[in-house]
Curated annotation (Swiss-Prot):
Pfam hit, one: Aminotran_3
Annotated keywords: Cytoplasm, Isomerase, Porphyrin biosynthesis, Pyridoxal phosphate
Subcellular location: Cytoplasm
EC number, UniProt record: 5.4.3.8
Pathway membership: Porphyrin-containing compound metabolism; protoporphyrin-IX biosynthesis; 5-aminolevulinate from L-glutamyl-tRNA(Glu): step 2/2
Family according to the record: Belongs to the class-III pyridoxal-phosphate-dependent aminotransferase family. HemL subfamily.
Top-level EC class as recorded in UniProt: isomerase
Subunit and interaction comment: Homodimer.
Keyword Cell membrane attached: no
Protein name per its UniProtKB record: Glutamate-1-semialdehyde 2,1-aminomutase
Gene name per UniProt: hemL
Residues modified to N6-(pyridoxal phosphate)lysine: K264
GO MF term (any one): glutamate-1-semialdehyde 2,1-aminomutase activity
Cofactor: pyridoxal 5'-phosphate
Amino acid sequence: MTNKEAFSEAKKFIAGGVNSPVRAFGSVGGEPIIIDHGKGAYIYDIEGKKYLDFIQSWGPLIFGHCDADIEKAVIEAVKKGLSFGAPTLVETTLAKILCEKFENLDKIRFVSSGTEATMSAIRVARGYSKKDGLIKFEGCYHGHSDALLIKAGSGATTYGNASSGGVPQDVVRNTYLAVYNDAASVEAIFESNPGKIGAVIIEPIAGNMGLVPADKEFLQSLRALCDKFGAVLILDEVMSGFRASEFGSLPYHGILADLVTFGKVIGGGMNAAAFGGKREIMDCLSPDGAVYQAGTLSGNPIAMSAGIAALSKINASKNLYAKLENLARRLMQGFKAAANEADIALQTNVRGSMFGYFFTPHAVKNYDDALKSDTRLFAKFHAAMLKRGVYLAPSQFETGFVCEPMSEADIDFAVNAAREAFKEIKRNG
């Protein structure tokens, strides 16, 4: 069966043929490849073609596909049972690893997805602050819960407008949109809505408008504004946690949030996420407090075991993040040089093992900047790279990832492919 035939079959039974929209390649044209298996830095489709994988399951696989230690931990856990819906030792072990690593994590709670983590963090923040208003930022993605599926109105201080069908306007009326990397837009919302804002949520390193890091001074201003107006500051580190560094985004700004969300890497490739923070906030959760949150598979032993194996490897690894950042920078420097040779404008960003690139001559600091990127050119580049065995995120507004099994030779292979791709694009127009 070919990729095309398999995708056609999938569309008969799965809505859109995929279980997450970006996988359909709608942003870049063409049709997706259908994956058969992965090993290390590479994936293989059902036609037997090999690709250097810079998606790595959208971030979780920092040690690549089929890591032996994580695989062993999962197999041993499966032998004991898939799920119990009851407390186990492994969930406490993983919770302890996380709480001991981050000084602002007094307690945490596990869930099964990043969407659940951010949704639950917002709920407990509102329960603690006794205020319903939430500030989020244009271009920041925090999962697909209704209150967060919004776009900006006529200005940063307006109510959000539902940007997905099926989301009632009443659900998003307490969500306010601010401009990323613009503290003045946040202060204006606080000032014009006295006593209403209970929480601010932000990706300190945005990953779904492409990779766009928040400025240190901007995040410090957010901390000060939340303190001044009595709002809970939530850092969404579902993507950046254990990806930007061993301590997530913290080394880049130094601020301590009231709540933090995690996902992806902490599950070692399995379905695990978490939210946690100050004791007085987390104690608002049921059964100790009045804020309800629950989940059948939350803290399931398979995901917890995979997470323990992944974080234990991280803790035992020397120079892991230095290696990964060097690879990511080598890749982006190579892409930029190749683009320059073809007289194509390209902006790049790197944070640890995360990278992003934009087809625009201007620096990208916020969502409006990101939208100026040439998505038509991106689509051509993506197709040209896929043809050459390099699997990049099929959207201008996603982040790429390197992994530990990758070598400089792998990066150079991708850079050479980019050089050929840019020449092809320039030649064909």
